[in-house]
Every structure is written in C-alpha cells, then in structure tokens.
Amino acid sequence: MRYTIFILSLLFPFLSIVAQPKHEVRAAWVTAVYGLDWPRTRATTPQTIRKQKEELIDILDKLKAANFNTILFQTRTRGDVLYPSAIEPFNSILTGKTGGNPGYDPLAFAVEECHKRGMECHAWMVTIPLGNKKHVASLGSQSVTKRMKEICVPYKREYFLNPGHPATKEYLMKLVREVVSGYDVDGVHFDYLRYPENAPLFPDKYDFRRYNKGRTLDQWRRDNISEIVRYIYKGVKAMKPWVKVSTCPVGKYRDTSRYPSRGWNAFFTVYQDPQGWMGEGIMDQIYPMMYFQGNNFYPFALDWQEQSNGRQVIPGLGIYFLHPDEGKWTRDEIDRQMNFIRKQKMAGEGHYRVKYLMENTQGIYDELSENFYAYPALQPPMPWLDNVPPTAPSALKVTHIDNGYTELTWQAATDNDQRNKPMYVIYASNDCLLYTSPS
C-alpha cells in the first residue's frame, strides 16, 4: 500500500497562530485517580474539606482565566466514584478511606463551580476496567466483583467488566442514570470503553459461544462495545436530550490511505468502532487520544475529521509529554498540532492533563492564555440535538453607574425550557461591533 507522508515544514513553515474561531471546545481533563490532578488534600475535617474544595476552585479559576470552556471532571475511576452513589463506593482519594464520605458532594460542587464560571462540566467515567486485585480487595463487599460476579472478568492481574455479558450495559447505564438524572451535567464522557490491551487473550470464550449468533470473535466483540454505546446514548437522550455524550477512543482508528497505524488502533486492537458510532449518530463528540507526534498524529487526526459524519472531533493532546519525566517533546510540537486542528476546522482540543497547565510546563499555559486562547470561545452548536434558537430576551436596559461601570438588565423569554436553555453572550467594544469575531 502507498502512503502519503505529511511534511510539516510545508504545512506550517512558521508557527503563526491560525485565526481564533468564535466557536471552539477548549477542554481539560481533571484527573482524580491517585490524586494526579486533584485532590491533594484528604477531606477529614471541616478545614480539610474547605481546603479540598479550594484546590478545585484554584484549578477552575486558572482555566477560566485562560478561556477554557469545558471541564472533563473524573467522576468514576475503577469501580468507585466521586459522588454519593447507591451503587458504588466513594473513591479513597477523597478521604484516604474507601467509601469514606468527604462531607460534601464533589460532583455537585464541580458542576456548580464550573457553571459559575460559564464553563461546561462533563462527568468523565472510566467504564470497563475495575482495577488490580489490590484495589478490588480494598472495596470489599461494595465492589461490583462481589455483588455481580457474573459480569466481571479477571485478566492479567486486573478485573474488568465483561462487554460480552448482556447485563454489563445495564450496570453501566445505572451509573450513568444516577449522574444524568441527579446532576446538571452538560455531558457524560466515557473512557476505556473498549477491550483491554492484548484483547485476543481476553477470557470470554463461554460468552462468545453463547451469544455470538454466527459472528466472528472480532465482530462480536466490536458489536458488544457498540451495543453498550448505543444503549447508553439512547438512555441519556431519553432522560435529557441536551446532555452531550462523548468518549475518548484510542488515537488511531485503523490504517489510513496516508499512513499505517503500526499495529495499535481502535478498530482491530481493542474493538472500538468510533467512526461507526458517529456514522450511526450514537455519539455527539469524540476526544481521540492523539498522544503522538508527526506522521503518527496528523494523518489520523485528519481521518477522524473526514469520517465524523458532522459530529464533533476534539483531539486529545498529550501535553504531559512536555515534562522531562514523561517525554522529550518541545512546545512547538503542541503548537503545530493546535494550529493543524484549527486549520482543519475541527471542533477544538482537549488537554491531558491539568497538572501541566497549572505548572505552566514549557510555558504551555502562558501560550494558551496570552495567544491561542486570548479571547473566549462559545461551544460549537450541535444541530442534530436542537436547531431551534432560544427566543431572544426583551426590555434591554443600559444604565451607566459609578466608576465607569455599565449595568445591563433584560427580561428573559418565558418559552425557553431546560431543553432550550439560553446562555447570554455580551459583546462590548469602543468601535463598531463585529459579532463574528472572537475578539
């Protein structure tokens, strides 16, 4: 097969910034597992509860100052959660003890604080992995491996939900239902919605014999993951049609005509079919984990966009590789990738992880806040969910008050409901306003 090699020097002879769009997803993953991003303090007293909350507020304030607009807040890790659940226990990272009540609801707090800052909050849920044997043992009788053994599989010193068991999708939907019905989240974001690495050895022969219905093992496994996606997507839309459903698949879908995936891809290696999900209309956004450089990034990012069926493609960028302990990337690599994303008119990008933004690793935060995200951006519209604009407000009144401040008041329309809830954007300029400009 012939492949096209992407010559970056031709694509970007210099690292000028592509014009900022008015609509763009600017997302960051807030990782709770092991306290990688948050929290650093255990909530065991009124003082430490306040400190834990302040740590999250500091993150949100800094991201807001850089004009981020989407927070992917880790809500489920591996068989445990960061909200009071009737199904799974609290993650130990909150208090130092599995199941320990932190004295507040972290997910509700995150949603409220994001909305105060005009940012969306998406509940990031790890789906199939349940953790290693030590972690599962720490959950005791609260672990799903004890309560629903039939849907759990031990494999390579870890436990996983079994995608081939019909009850697995029901179990995951119960968790999703708790979150979507109980919280004003703007989206649910699914991680590890796939088979594990080295999946050909996954111990599901019994289920395959029972449920395959004439399909090959590869097709059956791929259909299992797609059926989970389909079931959850329809369930979310039945509850709250405006809640966005997204996932972060493996960064390479499969070999492309431009470049090979070199054996690691979503479709064949871990049985994900995200392009099929977008084509079927059962996924609103994908955040492919594009933690690659050069020809391992650009051809595959473009492939996602070309096969998106109009759904939103938001490449996840591996900014953690800017740290010398993680990789040897220079910031120019991230700059080129962000410029490419804009030039190809993708919906935006996500940054993994928040820690490296907070620490301004290689000046990445300064570059975003001062240049690339210098102006705020609105969320890209999703016309397949709702193409009816909210009714405009009325009775706009401008009042000049003390110290050079101006107060705006208006009467909100009464025919807008939760399905069509407006967010107001205020433009200000000393010159003639240009509404299409992000500045």
Pin down the residues of each PLM region.
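Active-site-adjacent "subsite" loops/lids of carbohydrate-active enzymes
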Residues: 35-50, 128-178
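Catalytic domains of carbohydrate-active enzymes, especially glycoside hydrolases
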Residues: 54-79
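Aromatic- and acidic-residue-enriched segments that line the glycan-binding/catalytic groove
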Residues: 83-95, 129-155, 193-212, 260-263
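Active-site neighborhood of glycoside hydrolase catalytic domains
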Residues: 182, 187, 196-249, 253-259, ...
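Substrate-binding cleft of secreted/luminal carbohydrate-active enzymes
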Residues: 285-294, 314-381
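Solvent-exposed loop/turn segments flanking beta-strands in beta-repeat/beta-sandwich domains
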Residues: 415-431
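Conserved small/polar residues in nucleotide/adenosyl-binding loops
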Residues: 435-439
